[in-house]
Amino acid sequence: MFFKMLKEDVDVVFDQDPAARSYIEVILTYSGLHAIWAHRIAHALYKRKRFFIARAISQIARFFTGIEIHPGAKIGRRFFIDHGMGVVIGETCEIGNNVTVFQGVTLGGTGKEKGKRHPTIEDDALISTGAKVLGSITVGRGAKIGAGSVVLHDVPECSTVVGIPGRVVVQNGKKIRRDLNHQDLPDPVADRFRELENEIRQLKQELRRKEREDEL
């Protein structure tokens, strides 16, 4: 079972990366594969309470790959890290099957609380370059997180989230309409003009008062 999972980690590279040409190339040169293999060994030791050895393997993998995966994180089958540099996955993170993440992704916490404090990523999700998914939230099955997004709340399944903070723009293949009342949007320039008009009005009133005093 364990070795079958390792082979699936190789196979998913060919499914997801058109640049992959041979098993030798993938096994020897793909840092994402090296990181996930190291994690599977570290996680097995972590479950047996061999915490120090598990963390040591994790840190060695981080040094060689630039990918940091806490050995306590639970990761499903056919997990693919594309490019990978700067990926961080926290201790209580749970990742389902057939999940893809790109470089610079953080699956992290939002504080120092104990217990479940990292995201749950369900099957078939995709998290694009530089996205940050933070806190004990759930990214639903088949969801997509856009590049550079910051996600702080649950993401429905089969939806697409973009932006800071992340917002749903597509769900079940349909665009989400968000009507904006533009007249209610803040306008700092207009606000400053109103302040200047008030100041000018007050100065004119003060000037007229001074003129009346001089006439007397």
From Swiss-Prot:
Pfam entry (one): Hexapep
Protein family according to the UniProt entry: Belongs to the transferase hexapeptide repeat family.
Catalytic activity: L-serine + acetyl-CoA = O-acetyl-L-serine + CoA
Keyword field: Acyltransferase, Amino-acid biosynthesis, Cysteine biosynthesis, Cytoplasm, Repeat, Transferase
Gene that specifies this protein: cysE
Enzyme Commission number(s) from the entry: 2.3.1.30
Protein name: Serine acetyltransferase
Its biological purpose: Catalyzes the acetylation of serine by acetyl-CoA to produce O-acetylserine (OAS).
Activity regulation details: Inhibited by cysteine.
Molecular function terms, GO-annotated: serine O-acetyltransferase activity
Top-level lineage group: Bacteria
GO biological process, alphabetically ordered: cysteine biosynthetic process from serine
Subcellular location(s) of the protein: Cytoplasm
